Amino acid sequence: MVNAKQAQANKEDAKAWTLLENTLQASLQEQRRTRRWGIFFKSLTFLYLFVAIMLFSPLGNMDAASTSTGPHTAVIEVRGLIADQQEASADNLITSLRRAFDDENTRGIVMRINSPGGSPVQSGYIYDEIRRLRKEHPDTPVYAVITDLGASGAYYIAAAADEIYADRSSLVGSIGVTAAGFGFVGTLDKLGIERRTYTSGEHKAFLDPFQPERQDERQFWENVLENTHQQFIDRVKEGRGDRLADNEDLFTGLIWNGEQALELGLVDGLGSTSMVARDVIGVENTTDFTYRESPFERFTRQLGTSVGNTLAVHLGLSGPVIR
């Protein structure tokens, strides 16, 4: 009798445990289903927002320019790093310049600059286009106004203007070229890591930070930078002419404030955008022709820049920068 009761009790306990196990499994399955649906709806919401931004954001915003009426001074912002896939890229700034020059109501153009510089290639493209457009539109002057900073590649661009203005405390100059990197020779050996590099040219990997620096390759790279620096100097002399002071420090990479830059002939006067529009161009009404990225463009640019920078790091690609 006792054994029968014990067996019955064990059987009931087993049923209870089985029921509890089934209940827990059902609960876990329900949680998994809920989690999956949560992920699905979150993904769907993200996709909806992404598509909405893509469909309803314009490819580029220049609405202010398109609605301008009457004579005006065109203003184009040059902000941040001057480089491809950046807001201050040659493509964006040249687009803005062409639209400003082609507008029949434009009486003058102000390039409002606040930039540390960047790519000599992008700066050169913009410089050349300003000079070309000035020849096509001889009655439309171009002025550069440096606000906080107009250094290196930014000054390269400013040199193409008819005149350059700055604030007393603006930082102007830094006419030089730099290319920086690091040397990690011996680091991998200490970590017990063997690095294998395969090239088809003797100097193909001369910028590899994990290889010892060779004197002949260092000299070669310095010659490249010196040649690029000379191109920069030639453009500044072409744009500024005899307004430049005879000062041996002018092209050494030093930077000066606005008052000092005026004495050195790097700028023509002290003033703001509104002052130039009012007192120099003679049309106080300003219209912004700056190319503005849409949120979608900004997202894709940042994504592309991130991927490109990663590839550049892995491939050991680092070009000269004028800043």
What are these regions (language model features)?
Residues 174:
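Extracytoplasmic ligand-binding site segments that recognize negatively charged/polar headgroups
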Residues 1-167, 178-323:
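N-terminal organellar transit peptides
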